[in-house]
């Protein structure tokens, strides 16, 4: 492995980008980052070869390109930006595009005919396999997987199914923050601004202009941090959706088990009634006027039941008893909530860290203080009087100012002073 810096990216972009997006990159024998290396420069002698991960630029879902100057199903005019391509001889470095189109992730593989099945197994694609005769000996093929690619973690059949409903919308929102959809990528705009500010900063000799450029860089970094915070908020909403769905499933399981128990009880009682000796019914049938006496008893039982029901309704309609029932229900629900909130029954590891004002381990739902320097950081919902996660920022009782959404002015001032002195 050789660790290099890609020559096709500006210094500012190399500083900010990740390892596979323009920064110092580990590749096998070539001086390009994974994002720019669209070809594994392998000839018939197999000098380079091997398999490397990369990000390929091109429209999503392009069709194969074979021996033509244009894509079959995409808008680009260069074979370098197609989903599949083969080429001989390899293009020069200057022909490799940097950016443009939509991004997919894929895997480059040598494809000699004797081993094409192995290459297909290692680099699985959601496309129909092509015959190895389509490609010449020693050529390569690039596979573009649109969307999310778990690099080195199994084939496309192992991927999770698409989520439905609100969870799908949250996934799409997180994806839009990263790569956009029908618009410029937010992080690309930030990188462009950083690049321009860096170039102007390096050319400037005036101290005031240099400070202005530094402020521009600071604003761009703040924007990137806001994008990261927004993604974290989306992920927390997704976690909340999953937890709500889990609670719904648990409640449905409890109802299903209760219905099963009721059904089993009713079946046992019916079986016991069927096993009664039939002699009693035969003896009653042999008695004279048994039918008439049974009808009279049924009428009397119905009248008694209706009178008792009316009496119960009148008694239960008094406001005092209604109030007593309501208070009993509230007490029961409060005791149940306290039992659920208490972690006394949970096995506690002595080495586990403690949180919150109660200085106990983490359990149930917790919320984090938005003060980065908060000594406690995480709090139980029940300890800070929360029933659900509040919108926007939230500060703990030790860090808040006038309300829970504002930070204490003294703490905020000291925080700014420490940031300024760094």
UniProtKB/Swiss-Prot annotation:
Residues 405-422 are annotated as: PBR. Its main location: nucleus. Residues 322-334 have a biased composition (Basic residues). Gene3D superfamilies: 6.10.140.1740, Zinc/RING finger domain, C3HC4 (zinc finger) (3.30.40.10). There is a cross-link at residue 278 (Glycyl lysine isopeptide (Lys-Gly) (interchain with G-Cter in SUMO2)). InterPro entries: ING1_PHD_Znf, ING_fam, ING_N_histone-binding, Zinc_finger_PHD-type_CS, Znf_FYVE_PHD, Znf_PHD, Znf_PHD-finger, Znf_RING/FYVE/PHD. Isoform 2 was expressed in all normal tissues and cells examined, as well as in all breast cancer and melanoma cell lines examined. Isoform 3 was expressed in testis, liver, and kidney, weakly expressed in colon and brain and not expressed in breast and cultured melanocytes. Isoform 4 was highly expressed in testis and weakly expressed in brain, but not expressed in breast, colon, kidney, melanocytes, breast cancer or melanoma cell lines. Residues 261-349 are annotated as: Disordered. It comes from the Eukaryota. It is found in: Nucleus. Cooperates with p53/TP53 in the negative regulatory pathway of cell growth by modulating p53-dependent transcriptional activation. Implicated as a tumor suppressor gene. Interacts with H3K4me3 and to a lesser extent with H3K4me2. Interacts with TP53. Isoform 2 interacts with RSL1D1. This is Inhibitor of growth protein 1. It comes from Homo sapiens. The lineage of its organism: Eukaryota, Metazoa, Chordata, Craniata, Vertebrata.
């Amino acid at each position: 492995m050789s660790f290099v810096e890609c020559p096709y990216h500006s210094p500012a972009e190399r500083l900010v980008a990740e390892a596979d997006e323009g920064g110092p990159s580990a590749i096998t024998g070539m001086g390009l980052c994974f994002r720019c290396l669209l070809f594994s420069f392998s000839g018939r002698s197999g000098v380079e070869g091997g398999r490397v991960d990369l990000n390929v630029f091109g429209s999503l879902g392009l069709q194969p390109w074979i021996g033509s100057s244009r894509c079959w199903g995409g808008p680009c005019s260069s074979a370098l930006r197609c989903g599949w391509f083969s080429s001989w001889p390899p293009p020069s470095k200057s022909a490799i595009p940097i950016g443009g189109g939509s991004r997919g992730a894929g895997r480059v593989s040598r494809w000699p005919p004797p081993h094409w099945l192995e290459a297909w197994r290692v680099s699985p694609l959601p496309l129909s396999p092509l015959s190895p005769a389509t490609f010449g000996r020693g050529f390569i093929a690039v596979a573009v997987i649109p969307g999310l690619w778990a690099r080195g973690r199994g084939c496309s059949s192992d991927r999770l199914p698409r989520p439905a409903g609100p969870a799908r919308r949250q996934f799409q929102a997180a994806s839009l923050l990263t790569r956009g959809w029908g618009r410029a990528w937010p992080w690309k705009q930030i990188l462009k601004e950083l690049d321009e500010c860096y170039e102007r900063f390096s050319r400037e000799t005036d101290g005031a202009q240099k400070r202005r450029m530094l402020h521009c860089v600071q604003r761009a970094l703040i924007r990137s941090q806001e994008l990261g915070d927004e993604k974290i908020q989306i992920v927390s909403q997704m976690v909340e959706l999953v937890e709500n769905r889990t609670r719904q499933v648990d409640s449905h399981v409890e109802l299903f088990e209760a219905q099963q128990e009721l059904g089993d009880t009713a079946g046992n009682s019916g079986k016991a009634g069927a096993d009664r000796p039939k002699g009693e019914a035969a003896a009653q049938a042999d008695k004279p006027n048994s039918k008439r006496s049974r009808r009279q008893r049924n009428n009397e039982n119905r009248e008694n039941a209706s009178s008792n029901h009316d009496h119960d309704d009148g008694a239960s309609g008094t406001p005092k008893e209604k109030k007593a029932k309501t208070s009993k229900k509230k007490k029961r629900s409060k005791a149940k909530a306290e039992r659920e909130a208490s972690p006394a029954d949970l096995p506690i590891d002595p080495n586990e860290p403690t949180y919150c004002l109660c200085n106990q381990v983490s359990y149930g739902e917790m919320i984090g203080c938005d003060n980065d320097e908060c000594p406690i950081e995480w709090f139980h919902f029940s300890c800070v009087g929360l029933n659900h996660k509040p919108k926007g920022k939230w500060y703990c009782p030790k860090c808040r100012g006038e309300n829970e959404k504002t930070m204490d002015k003294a703490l905020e001032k000291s925080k700014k002073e420490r940031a300024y002195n760094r």
